[in-house]
Amino acid sequence: MTVLSVDLASRRYRDNGIALLRGRWGHARCEILSADALGLDGEPDAQTFAALLHDVAVREGARLILLDGPQGWRAEQSALVHQRRCERESLAPGKTGLPGVVKPATWTRMALFSIALFDALHAHGWPRITAAWNGERAAIESFPTQAWRSLGVPAMPGRASTPSVDPWRAHLAALGVHDVPSTVTHDEVQAVVAALVGLQLLGAGFSAVDARGCDPHRDGEHWREGWILSPRR
């Protein structure tokens, strides 16, 4: 079983952490893919990035693509004002409200890019996952902070507050993830921990994972709501 995971960045391709995880829950091997090695440079473009992720996933036999970023907007009928249900249940700091409304406002670029990337992946045959998922290809919204929490591990702080990722490399090893290189970056570690839910899904199904939110749905021009999925220990 193979999954492809991205800790997403919208300003520079090189800031994206990209990881392949192969194996099964409790015993997996990691491969880090650098933007440079993939021929990516400059400012990310959703269509270009989606096409490349599709090509990598097909070549490597991955059935799931995970992105650390929002997949849609808040539903019109939601009782929540500023965020989607999955963000509320995951205590996510970034919040997507009605179309175009993002909190904090400085996160708007990232939110728009992420939603556009989910849309582009959908066009390549990677629809947003639903609770009725039955093993087919799908795109999944991840949240590494929630992944660490649901595994019972202290979440890794932001890049500027993390002088060394070695403690979290050790946590990954204890979870059965092998071949995480000593040169791994903060964003790559986050991509790896987020990927674990993909192996759990492929091995045991939707009911086995930590699922926050509700099924995504299309409302006019926009996708709304969606699941944030994390591994469950």
List PLM regions with ranges.
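RNase H-like (RuvC/DEDD) metal-dependent nuclease/polynucleotide-processing core
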Residues: 1-4, 8-233
